[in-house]
Amino acid sequence: MSDTAELTTDPTPDLTKGDTITVEVTRPAHGGEGIAHHGGRVIFVRGGFPGDDVDVEITQVKKRFARGFVVQVNVASPHRVDSRCPAAAAGAGCCDYAELSPEAELEIKSRVLTDQLQRIGGLADIPTPELFELEPSQGWRTRVRLGVDASGRAGFRKLRSNDLVTDVACSQVVPELIDGLVGPGARTFTPDSEVIAAIDDRGVRTVVEVRKAPRGRRAETILHVLEGDGSVEQTVGDHTWTFPVSGFWQAHTKAPGAYSAFIGEVLDGAELVDVDKRGPVAWDLYGGVGLFVPVINRALGAHVHSVELSEGSAEAGDDALAGLPVTFHAGRVESVTSQLPKPHVVVLDPPRTGAGSDVVATIAGAKPQLVVHIGCDPATFARDVADWSAGGYTLDRLAVFNAFPATHHYETIGVFTRKSA
């Protein structure tokens, strides 16, 4: 069920691209837009928040919906504030919630998730989301990818554009992360490349030029190491990982610890059955460097099979977690899992595109007693939830982490158990 399905009248035909209309935004939509109505159409309003009365320039017109962006705020939503991000104020697409009150942000994100679970996930009975704010709300990003223009200047991409904002910084970023990389007097780079910069838990900055990763992949190809040795060190609990700066790691400095703590609390309460003398088996899918392996092992005493497409990430995890009962497998989840022992518990953290029907069906076919599913896109997460339901699983708990403050993005963790026969 889409947002346009709620219309009961035929849209008027006179709306065209470039028109300016006045609308009231009534609720949030997935993707950071607000929803309004005009002439029988749903209007998706970029830059609009619930309660806004705004003038909108139309950029796209379809039969039952249109899209546009705010050109003037006539009556401001009570949730609207002055922009919290200089780069976003200059047109960058980094912080699309920069003008949304921090106090309203997580509640609006929760509303969007619930809506997606109803419309796409087909759920009528949704657990009340457990909401987690991650602090700080500014200066939280310790790794960033920058575009580079034809003259070699690095900056933040404008919304749905290859153009860059090169003169001011984004408020997400730890200030010292981009000192000398963005803004007046910054160094230049290879034109039309991309730059990854990261500050790790040692306080060491690494800067590399990369070739952009293919869609759906987490790792870039490093072309030049410009600062540091091309690797980063990250520590959670008693374990330290060393891996290439282009490898995947959570963006918010507090996210790894927060997710690990929640997963640990879930698994601590698990009552597993049919466990033989060798102990339980757990799958850690899309596991990266094995961030969640220690907490899985600590909570369950399980042997963990961690599956990750990137061979470099799997090797980094193997090095960091030597001595723990874990086996790393480099390969595609859908290929490797058929060779693994049946799991009692599965933790999976798929990319933004989601796990997909085939992977969910494969996992469900292995009949784990408990599944912890991490999602960073509410629409694909909701689609996966529908597949879990079809595979015989019930969504018992739902957590929302505001891990990307001032943006429409957030992290969701769903806890699933097998339905009773």
From Swiss-Prot:
It holds the Pfam family tRNA_U5-meth_tr. The active site is at residue 376. S-adenosyl-L-methionine binds at residues 250, 286, 308, 349. It comes from the Bacteria. Its EC number is 2.1.1.-. Disulfide bonds: none annotated. Keywords: Methyltransferase, S-adenosyl-L-methionine, Transferase. The keyword Mitochondrion does not apply. GO terms for molecular function: rRNA (uridine-C5-)-methyltransferase activity. Gene3D superfamilies: Nucleic acid-binding proteins, Vaccinia Virus protein VP39. One of its GO terms (biological process) is rRNA base methylation. Residues 14-72 form the TRAM domain. Belongs to the class I-like SAM-binding methyltransferase superfamily. RNA M5U methyltransferase family. This is Uncharacterized RNA methyltransferase CE1797.
